[in-house]
């Protein structure tokens, strides 16, 4: 009896040891899988990646060509006694915006404007952690374009291709707010709403810029873009009324984006207003 009881207990102890060993091995495997999964997840979404670097480069190049084309039209018009003409300048700005939207829109979203980037961020359509890099890229592109233009045409005051208030600062501030509101409202409609025809976004945004420059250019210069003003100001050393071209576009863009969001959906609560996108859906995955 005693011998048989010892054999059964020994078998039970061996069984328990095997079960405990199996549980320990399974736990180690699960921990290893979790660690590997977390590492893989962090590698898939790093703070800085090649993909994001490509977006930043696209913003630099897109802003460079936009500012170079638009400001070159202004500089050439002043140097040649008005051969480009004011309507020609307006058309140049509109076409430059349209071309850049179609060129880099599928890569970076073609913000090309710190006010647009900030407005998208406030609506939850662009990650806040990416805003400084985008804004720096846009200002850098504008400054590089301005430096190239200065090298080509010189920096004489009479050939100034930046923006400065033609009237009072308050008048220019109001004008910049309104035209940037208008621009961002259109951008939100044609570039972020699934119901809009996304393929026409570049045409619509470019046409809006053309119209804005046409009627606001003689008043404020129709900047609509802090980078458009800051770049030439840095290179040419002229900062007259620069605060107007930062405050006006920033507040106008944010207001325009939210105004469209308020009318985007009529059958959904406010908390769902900023949950869809079409043309800039790539920026939401950053």
UniProtKB/Swiss-Prot annotation:
Residue ranges, compositional bias (Polar residues): 34-44
Pfam family, one: MIP
Short sequence motif named NPA 2, residue ranges: 225-227
Annotated keywords: Membrane, Repeat, Transmembrane, Transmembrane helix, Transport
Keyword match Transport: yes
Residue positions of motif NPA 1: 113-115
Listed transmembrane segments: 56-76, 84-104, 131-153, 172-192, 200-220, 239-259
Location relative to the cell: Membrane
Matches recorded under CDD domains: MIP
Membrane topology, record value: Multi-pass membrane protein
Entry's family note: Belongs to the MIP/aquaporin (TC 1.A.8) family. NIP (TC 1.A.8.12) subfamily.
Protein name, UniProt field: Aquaporin NIP1-3
Organism from which the protein derives: Oryza sativa subsp. japonica (Rice)
Underlying gene: NIP1-3
